[in-house]
Amino acid sequence: MFSTATSPYDDLVIKATDENLASEDWALNMDVCDKVSSDGQNGARQAVTALQKRLSHRNPNVQIYALELANSLAQNCGKDLLGELSSRNWTSALDRLINDRATSTPVKKKALSFVKSWAKQIEETGDPNLGLMGELYDQLRAKNHVFDEPEPTPESAEEARRRQEEEELQRVLELSKQDKGGRSLFTYQPSGSAGASSSSAANNNTSPSIPQSQAQPLAQDQAQSQAAPQVTGYAPQPQKIYSPQPLEPEPPRVDLNTATCVRAIYPFTGQEVGELDFERGDVIKVLDRGFKEWWRGACNGKIGIFPVTYVEALPEPTPKELQEKAQEEARVFASLGLVDQLLQTLKGIDPARGDKLDDHPEIEEMYQASVALQGQINTLIKKYSDQKAELEHMNANFIRAMGQYEELRNGPPLVQAQPFGYVPPQPQPLLQQQNSYSYQQYPQQPQQQPQPYAQAPYAQQAQPQLQPEQYAQQTPSPAAQSQASYTAQQQPYPAQVQQDPAAASPPPNQPFYHHGGSTTSVNRIPSAQTAVQPQPHGAPSFPPSSPPTRQVTEPGVAGLGAGDQQAWDQYYQQHGQQAPHSSQHPSQPQSQPQSQPQSQPQSQQGSYYPAHAQAQGYQAAYATVPDGRAYASPPLPGTQQGQGVEGVTAGMDRMSVHAP
C-alpha cells in the first residue's frame, strides 16, 4: 500500500543542498532542472517532494539552498513545476517555515521574497487551478509580514557613471531655477534712441556678469537719468545658466598585465591536470605570468593555470577598503565567543527534565546572531585557504631555489680516488646458489671423475651415481657378485659436467682426507656416524657414503673381502669352484671382465685429494684383483705389480693409511 522505495531525486537534491557547501552549486541545480524537464510531470512531483523534505531541515544553509533550487526549477521547468509549487503540501511547508520562530531571519526573508515572486509568476499564467500560492501570499500579507523585494543586481561602472551624471544635471537645474540673478527689475524698451538702445543692450549683455547686490543700484540710476517715458511691459524670464561642476575623476583603468587580482567573467572547467577551475565572478589572485595566454593563480584554495581571456583586472583596494575589511574580520573573530556561549547554554537544556527552548528567549537571540556570522565565516575560510595555497606554493619554490643554490655553491660531489688495481667486489648470487645446491641437492649434480690413466675397459664407462636413500640403505656386498645383481642396483647417470682437475685440490691450510682406491677394508672412509666434513670450494658434490665398519683381521690376510668368509663361500658355490687356502686369493673368472666390487664407487672419491694421492689410490685400486693378475692397464713406471696380499701390502706401504 505504501511504497518505501526512495525517489531518484533524493540523492540529487541532497547533494545540491548539502550543508557543507559554501554557496549555491549552480551546476548541480541545472542538472536537476534538466532531469525534471526530461521526466515531465512525474519528475516535477518527485523533485518538489524531495525539496519539501529539505525545508524541514534545521540547518539554515540547507533551507536557503532548497529555496534557491526551487526558484531555479520554477524559472526553467515550465507549467508542470509551477503546478507542483501551488500544491497544498508545498504551500503548507512554506507557511510553517515562515511562521516558525526558530527559522532564521535570512531564511524567512528569502522565503517571503520567493512567495511573492512565485505568486506573481503563477498569476501571469491565467490558470485558475493554481491559486493556492496567491492565497498564501494574501494570508502572509494580512499578518503584516514584510515582503522585501529581491536584491538588485550590481550595476556596472558605465551605468553608475551615467546615473551620476544625470543626478548632477538635475541638481544644477534646481539651483538655476532658484537663482534669478536680479533680472526681474529690468524693463523691456521696444523703441528708443540708438544711444538708449545701445546702452540698454549693453546693460542687458553685462547684467548676467554683475552680482545681484550691484545690479539693483545700477538699474535705479539708469531709470532716474532717462527723461523719456518708459513703457512697462514683458519682463523676460531669467535664462538658464549652466555651469557644470567638475565631476569626480574617473578611476584609472587597471592594466591586466600589472593587476594582482583578477575576476572571472566566464566559468572555466579545466580539461588537463594543473588547470584551475572557477565560476563566473570568482576572484583569482595572480601568482605567476610565465606565459602570455596562461597565468598561474590561486582560487578557492587551489593553485593552477587559467586562461587570461577569461578574466578581467580588478583595481587595487584602497586603504579605506582594507581598513573596513580588517574591522569586519575583527568583529567575526570577536563573535566566536558568542558561538561558544550558545553551545554551553544548549548543553544545559535537558528535554527529559521538561526544558523547552521557548522558555529561554536568549537562546533564540544568540542563535540568530550566530547564523548571521555564517556568511562572513565562509568568506574568511575562502580567503585563508587561498593564502595557505599561496604560501605552500612559495615554500615549494623556496626549497627548489635553496637546493639549486647549494648545488652551485658547493659544486658537484668529488669522486673518491681508489687505489691502483682496485676492483670492487661483485656479488655472485648465482654462484652462491649453486654452492648451496651442491650441499643439499647432490643427486642432481653429476660430476665427471678425472681419469689419470688410459684404461681400456673403463675409459668410456660412466661411474654410477646413487641416490641418497640408496646410500643410506645399501649394505656392503662382497666383491664377487654377478654382473646382473650389480647393475640392477645402479641408476642411469645423467650427463656429466667436465671440471678442471685443479679445482678439485683443496685450499691451503685446510684439513682433508685422502684414501687410496683400495679393494681392501684397510683404507675405509670414516663411518657415516661421524660428522661429515664440509666440502671445499670447487670440489665435486659427491654424497656422503656409508661404508661398512672395518673388521679387525690379521696382518697379511687383509685381502679383498677379508673378514667376510661367508660371502666368499657363497661366491665359490655359484661358480662351482673350490675355495683355495687362506693365503691365496681365488682367481676371478674371465667371463666377467666388467664386474666391479661394490666398494668401487668409494674408491672414486680420490678426487677429493691431491694429485699424488690420486695416482697411488688408482694404482692400489686397479693393481690387484682376487686372482692376483693385473685388471687394468699396466702400472706406472717405477712401480711394482704385487700378487695377492703381497701386492696389496706393497701398495699400502706407498700411501697414507688412516684408521676409521
UniProtKB/Swiss-Prot annotation:
Membrane spanning residue stretches: none
Biased composition, class Polar residues, residue ranges: 517-533
One of the record's GO cellular component terms: endosome membrane
Localization per Swiss-Prot or TrEMBL: Endosome membrane
Recorded topology in the membrane: Peripheral membrane protein
GO MF assignments: phosphatidylinositol binding; ubiquitin binding
Main subcellular location of this protein, as a coarse class: membrane
Region entry Disordered, spans: 146-254, 437-660
Gene3D superfamilies membership: 1.20.5.1940, 1.25.40.90, SH3 Domains
Entry protein name: Class E vacuolar protein-sorting machinery protein HSE1
Originating organism: Cryptococcus neoformans var. neoformans serotype D (strain B-3501A) (Filobasidiella neoformans)
Top-level taxonomy: Eukaryota, Fungi, Dikarya, Basidiomycota, Agaricomycotina
Gene name as annotated: HSE1
